[in-house]
Amino acid sequence: MEPTRLVRPFEVVSEYQPSGDQPKAIAELAGRITAGETDVVLLGATGTGKSATTAWLVEAVQRPTLVLAHNKTLAAQLANEFRELLPNNAVEYFVSYYDYYQPEAYVPQTDTFIEKDSSINAEVERLRHSTTNSLLSRRDVVVVSTVSCIYGLGAAEEYLEAMVALQVGQNVGRDQLIRRFVAMQYERNDIDFSRGKFRVRGDTIEIIPVYEEHALRIELFGDEIEALYSLHPLTGEVLARTDAVSVFPATHYAASPATIQRAIGTIQTELHDRLVELEREGKLLEAQRLRMRTQFDIEMMEQIGFCSGIENYSRHIDGRAPGEAPHCLLDYFPDDFLVVIDESHVTVPQIGAMYEGDASRKRTLVEHGFRLPSAMDNRPLRWNEFKERVGQTVYLSATPGQYELGIADGVVEQIIRPTGLVDPQILVKPTKGQIDDLLEEIRARAERDERVLVTTLTKKMAEELTDFLAEAGVKVRYLHADVDTLRRVELLTELRSGVFDVLVGINLLREGLDLPEVSLVAILDADKEGFLRSSTSLIQTIGRAARNVSGEVHMYADVLTDSMKKAIEETSRRSELQVEYNRANGIDPQPLRKRIADITDILAREEADTAKILAGRDQKRKSPTPSLRSGGIAAQGAAELESLIADLNAQMLAAAGELKFELAARLRDELSDLKRDLRQMEKAGHLS
């Protein structure tokens, strides 16, 4: 069944207009896509605004779009940018919802079985459901995703078939609705009303869909829907009235009772065949293990239509043939969707590598009787299967890989930056006396309040260099593999803010990293050929200095390698084009002004603040916000006071939602005092 999707145009809302190479790139990309070219490469230099170009391209072609990034942090950054550029359209974020994930595994050498263990991030899970909801209900959708989009997901047809469409005046019984919601894996809970649950009070049913922040109230009169309301789940405040709404399942692995019964039949057939095979091979322990585990899962499915690890039976539930590719997020898109692969030189190999890593683990589980062979078909797509499911693809990169360049119908260049900034000057210096030279360059930059990145080849060298620079009085930090993602964000923010001047690391290229304050990138051992000193890595590293007007790259080397030569020639070519464009158009290069903030930084800060507030461990605090009021009410402007009231109100509701009622009461009292102060300011005429 093909869903009916709301049609609304994509519209970019921005105070800026395309500039530099952007207008030409947008027009050429749109022209090639419209002409039907299957694969197109956008070779965009660092800092030329490839994300903005993508948004304008989507506006030009008016097609649902999947944007692929190679890690969660970059995906979050891209989603944030697209939401700012396309505020009136659905920009969704689809990544793995696990904060922690230990997959099911077996180690034959030690006879150790590791149970699946995971911690699910409820908010990311909501965003995943929001993605599928948007894809099946509207066309103006941009989904920013990682490789999660190629992993198994329930069939779109089953998901859509399980949906409940509600309309005012519709004839439907209360008990019938309750049964439908339970079949969709919603839990009835009249006490703890939260996402994925519903409650019943007389002829009124209230439900919070897994993809929504607000609740839905269904008021019935007999067997007829009398009214539908959107309401705040905690306060019960009615936010809006609607005439029609659709409720999608609480799980992507939705299946009708008939489908489950059919699947149970084929699972039992496969189990019988596999047991015969194992017993014939003399693997009696494995056979008994498989019989017990599978029979338990079958009983669970017979009783409640679901079982833990049901995704391992997805081939049976979907009715797929052995070896057939699983359903995934790509199946939820309309047929004419566009794919944009960001940092394609990294993301393309990543997509291709996912299948084999998953298969090797499951192969061991199957061989030792922990899973049926059909569990192998709950897997990510192979590369060729991915290509079959996507249509036209745009590959974005400052350094496109051989694969993209080989299959592309054409390469579109975006070299000129909107800011007029040119690629950095590259100097090759001898290794003799390199540390003294580097120290001198660092001190010169520090005096100008500029920052420096230093990249080395080994962990030991990075540590020793950091110690040496620190002893020489340089404010320096060392970024290494053991630093977690959020701490890495903090380090980069501290670098930009001037807490320290130099960051030393091994692999600092970090595609998509924006550091406008960095005016010098020093590459030690630049002539040591290898992954970290390939032409691609060198160009990416050089790009870290391309966001500063006085950016320079110093390569310390005694030999000019082929990789160095390619990187220098490509950078020089781009620089010449940029300088010529600036001269012809009278453009004076402007420094890139970017807020010292990042979506992961913001999320981390909010998460820490919320945890601190909700913990409520310091019982001695009379007010949870003494520092905000320590200067007296006169120290607070009206706007700040109103903002504080809004923040505290949100914290109070969050505390109540977490059942932290004592904290919520303290916040309520604090709110009451602040509102009284605000009223006094109004009476005194301090508010306009």
From Swiss-Prot:
Residues 614-633 are annotated as: Disordered. The UvrABC repair system catalyzes the recognition and processing of DNA lesions. A damage recognition complex composed of 2 UvrA and 2 UvrB subunits scans DNA for abnormalities. Upon binding of the UvrA(2)B(2) complex to a putative damaged site, the DNA wraps around one UvrB monomer. DNA wrap is dependent on ATP binding by UvrB and probably causes local melting of the DNA helix, facilitating insertion of UvrB beta-hairpin between the DNA strands. Then UvrB probes one DNA strand for the presence of a lesion. It is found in: Cytoplasm. The keyword Signal does not apply. Its main location: cytoplasm. PROSITE patterns: HELICASE_ATP_BIND_1, HELICASE_CTER, UVR. It comes from the Bacteria. GO terms for biological process: nucleotide-excision repair; SOS response. GO terms for cellular component: cytoplasm; excinuclease repair complex. The beta-hairpin motif is involved in DNA binding. A motif (Beta-hairpin) lies at residues 97-120. Forms a heterotetramer with UvrA during the search for lesions. Interacts with UvrC in an incision complex. Residues 31-414 form the Helicase ATP-binding domain. ATP binds at G44, A45, T46, G47, T48, G49, K50, S51. Keywords: ATP-binding, Cytoplasm, DNA damage, DNA excision, DNA repair, Excision nuclease, Nucleotide-binding, SOS response. Residues 642-677 form the UVR domain. This is UvrABC system protein B. SMART domains: DEXDc, HELICc. GO terms for molecular function: ATP binding; ATP hydrolysis activity; DNA binding; excinuclease ABC activity.
